[in-house]
Amino acid sequence: MATSAPVTSRTETLAKYLKLDQKGQIMAEYVWVDAAGETRSKSRTLPEKDYKAEDLPVWNFDGSSTNQAPGDNSDVYLRPCAVYPDPFRGSPNIIVLAECWNAGGTPNKFNFRHDCVKVMDTYAEDEPWFGLEQEYTLLGPDNRPYGWPTGGFPAPQGEYYCGVGTGKVVQRDIVEAHYKACLYAGIQISGTNAEVMPAQWEYQVGPCLGIEMGDQLWVSRFFLARITEEFGAKVSLHPKPIAGDWNGAGLHSNFSTKAMREEGGMKVIEEALKKLEPHHAECIAEYGEDNELRLTGRHETGSIDSFSWGVANRGTSIRAPRETAAKGYGYFEDRRPASNADPYRVTKALLQFSLA
């Protein structure tokens, strides 16, 4: 059977070209979300200036090649919605996050940002804050978790979470590169750590206000995909990449409103959870693919079939941190979203169903 050798970028050779004068031009990398819930991108040259999203030109791409449009009407338009410094090419080059729109002026079927903005605007006075914990698994050329023995398994879980040292963690260089790239670009990345399963990591983004949460998480995912590309690794957002007695991967979603963060906020949180409970099935439908493999009631998850909450309990649908309960105000954590969930869909559902 044919096999392919891992391919890594020659970044040391590329470095000398990145220093060349651009003659008053910049490179703008337009990034969008495709039909499979993954990022795509392409570049264009623009005159050098300080750009805001509204200053940037609308562009287009072949939607028939991304399963976002039919071949006989394939143009999908890219409408810029957020701009970030480019950590790969450096200043003055930019990353442009764009929404996908159809030729007829309607949002593309896979443009979940559009409806999310509407909900965020509806509840803007509540000042919704979000913080998302993105778990992911690094894979090698054989599509097995990086560093796992060929044809076998590592030692059982227990020594890997926040681990330090050879045999406990792998590919920390990818994690560090991603952390610095996010900071450079202005992503509100708040931390990172090794997770319970070997080759699994997590980073946190937030707190972010409203729509900025989804925007920043999608750009951070794009950065992660680009960085693993350079290191010859793959990143998986599958919520249960390895069957058996191994933790899955989630997108734990921390949420609060202004009223929850003030004195007496715990009562507001409890009322919000009462409103969330009857919408459990609707939330699960928005919270990612293959989540039934992860939400089993084991491995620090609640059951996919029922809604539950508790203080400092990681085996429930919703966890109220011990500190929040002790102070009487703060935030809560929705532990149901899968690692591959769309942050626009998650934050929209969480805000809409907890306040409606």
UniProtKB/Swiss-Prot annotation:
Enzyme Commission number: 6.3.1.2
Subcellular location: Cytoplasm
The protein's enzyme class: ligase
S-S bonds: none
GO biological process: glutamine biosynthetic process
Chief location bin: cytoplasm
Domain annotation GS catalytic: ranges: 112-356
Catalysed transformations (reactions): L-glutamate + NH4(+) + ATP = L-glutamine + ADP + phosphate + H(+)
Keyword Nucleotide-binding: yes
Domain spans labelled GS beta-grasp: 26-105
Cellular component GO terms, alphabetical: cytoplasm
Keywords tagged on the record: ATP-binding, Cytoplasm, Ligase, Nucleotide-binding
PANTHER family: GLUTAMINE SYNTHETASE, GLUTAMINE SYNTHETASE 2 CYTOPLASMIC
Name of the protein in question: Glutamine synthetase
Organism of this sequence: Fusarium solani subsp. phaseoli (Nectria haematococca)
Lineage: Eukaryota, Fungi, Dikarya, Ascomycota, Pezizomycotina
